[in-house]
Design a protein with these regions (language model features):
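All-alpha RGS (Regulator of G-protein Signaling) helical domain and cognate RGS-like helical scaffolds
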Residues: 2-11, 20-24, 29-263
Length: 263
């Protein structure tokens, strides 16, 4: 996954077609909960397109964090660093279920592909993880711009804040990687392709939009991870697919749970 894939109109149309997102704009409107219909105009096909793209991203995030917890280097992390990863897994699953409750649809993509040394190399894993979080942050900011419903805009901002936490915490974990696992890792390369020092781990004054203004740009960035043909073109290991397995999440603190779309 890199920024070179972003903006391909043909790839975006192919991806949307295979995901069935265009049909979802009409097919799911009748099944949406009351909150999605609160405004006179209701939820729009554009809203559904963003939400289904977000579901794909969250399914990918859950799959990524799940397999990080199974990686050999994970066992050698400090307990608090392990806790960051485990909590992020729960949070991403909660995001997925919330979005699914609005669309009435499951993610159309549930199998994902990574570089060959993903989960065996801590450096590769953290670079990919931060790249994904970069993409998720920018994608939710598109939702903030483009959702037709105020409650959905605010919810996108609330989720984006958590994705920002995850990006920072991945950078916190990097120096704690054990020497036997290639640590300490002092630089992380995210989606912009620039190696950035992990000191400080919270190195953004403002979240990065990546210049994205349309959800198709986020979809194009995720294409090599979610689509086998695109993964092969990107040089990813398609012989070892990873499957999304939903579960019932337990969030770390009741005060931080989703109580309503109103906040």
């Amino acid at each position: 996954m890199n920024r070179e894939t972003v903006g391909s109109g043909t790839d975006r149309r192919t991806f949307l077609g295979r995901a069935g997102i265009a049909a979802a704009g009409v097919a799911t409107l009748g099944a949406l909960p009351a909150i999605a219909k609160a405004d006179a105009g209701g939820i729009t096909p554009g809203d559904v397109e963003i939400l289904v793209a977000a579901e794909i991203a969250e399914a990918l995030a859950v799959t990524t964090y799940t397999n990080i917890t199974r990686a050999a280097f994970f066992a050698n992390l400090a307990s608090d660093d392990q806790g960051y990863i485990e909590a992020a897994r729960q949070e991403e699953m909660s995001h997925y279920l919330l979005e699914q409750s609005v669309t009435g649809k499951s993610s159309p993509f549930t199998t994902f592909y990574y570089p060959a040394d993903m989960f065996s190399s801590a450096r590769t894993t953290l670079n990919v993880l931060v790249s994904l979080e970069d993409a998720f942050i920018a994608a939710y900011l598109i939702g903030v711009r483009q959702f037709s419903h105020d409650d959905l805009r605010v919810t996108a901002a609330r989720i984006m804040g958590i994705e920002s936490d995850h990006r920072t915490l991945a950078r916190v974990v990097a120096p704690g990687v054990a020497a036997q696992d290639g640590g300490p890792i002092e630089e992380i390369t995210g989606l912009q392709g620039v190696a950035e020092s992990v000191d400080p781990p919270n190195n953004n004054g403002y979240e990065r939009t990546l210049g994205w203004t349309k959800i198709g740009q986020a979809i194009a960035a995720l294409l090599p991870v979610a689509d086998k043909d695109a993964a092969e073109k990107a040089g990813f290991d398609t012989s070892k697919p990873y499957t999304f397995h939903p579960f019932t999440p337990v969030l770390p603190n009741p005060l931080g749970e989703f109580h309503s779309f109103k906040g």
